[in-house]
């Protein structure tokens, strides 16, 4: 089950994917990938997703940004254990756009599997860091909306 749908190949096919390799240090005392590693991977790979939707790698980040997504909330679901070593596929998809916020569904899959081991819904607020205020969602986010069917 990914993004709340059973057996939906459409969800996977319409999503952006990147990958990561687990590291020995990712393993906890129970012998599986530690729960904190999943969120760390998503944070690290989020830039790949942003580069993909904007089609570039040069834009202002951080406190110089006049239009960036600011993480407002996340809903996290741990589905099954993962053991090292393994290649992970990370899927991202914008599934909801409001006037000033949007949702990104993300799933982490063991390479070759169709069901995720972990999934999240991150809600971002479009934010101008220079003026320190929320702003309307950028057209690039709207153009990349792929609603769940």
State what each model feature region is.
Residues 14-23:
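Short amphipathic
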Residues 38-64:
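Active-site helix/loop of acyl-thioester processing domains in fatty-acid/polyketide metabolism
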Residues 1-12:
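Single conserved hydrophobic/aromatic residue that forms the stacking wall/gate
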Residues 35:
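Catalytic-site-adjacent helices and loops of nucleotide signaling machinery
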Residues 8, 78, 82-87, 94-149:
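HotDog/MaoC-like acyl-thioester-processing domains
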Residues 63-91:
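Helix-adjacent hinge/juxtasegments
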